[in-house]
Amino acid sequence: MQTPTRSVLVLLAGLFLTFAAVSVAPGSDIPPHGKAVVLFKGHDLRNFDTFLRAQGLNHDPDHVFLVENGVIHVSGKEFGYIITRKEYANYYLRAEFKWGEGTYAPREGQARDSGILFHVQGAQKVWPTSIEFQIVEGGTGDFWMTDGGALTGTDGVRVTGPPGKASKIDRIGKGPWTNVAGYRDPVGELENPRGEWNLLELVVQGDHVRQFVNGKLANEGSAAYPSSGKILFQSEGAELFFRDIRLYPLKK
């Protein structure tokens, strides 16, 4: 049996990494139509504004959002968000997150909660008109339609968030849910154990939306309203971290 050469080993390693990456990429059947838009490069929040319920726009004296060690540390101690300065439509978005330790009032001791709100329109507030890719212990992958946002689920039922409130579409295969810190879905948990990184992927084409958690389809909807807008990442009473936030343009 011949011993593989160094060049062959390098080639095989490269192929393994390529196939490993593809295996968790739900957008692999939807080729990007342009260069990646790297929203967070690990250094600063130059592509975002901040908004906090108690502090307003771009005033974060307590460092609720802090870039350190190449990741965004979200303390969760105040309700608010970082929001892209530009609007987007027709894209594949990927981001990684993991939970920290802390939970804070008014959600102290409750399931750790955050989210990625997309197609954001209207005035800066908690929370603006949008559709949410929910991030919550035991329920990551749910849809929430907020303040007039609307979506039709795979069952054909259209769900609209009332003014100033939100309405939900549960993720596919979701089991019973309990609002307690550390909760994990006993039926179909998609998250990795707390403290480990999770991959979130969002595919938006026209008014059709798909959400993936760690490579698995979590939810799907159509006739999205709005169908374009800014993208925000929440602080909602729980400590968490985000990294590697990238967006790839898609054809409609």
Please report, for each region that a protein language model flagged, where it lies by residue.
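N-terminal secretory signal peptides that target proteins for export/translocation
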Residues: 1-6
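Bacterial N-terminal signal peptides
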Residues: 10-20
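Carbohydrate-interacting regions of secretory-pathway proteins
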Residues: 24-252
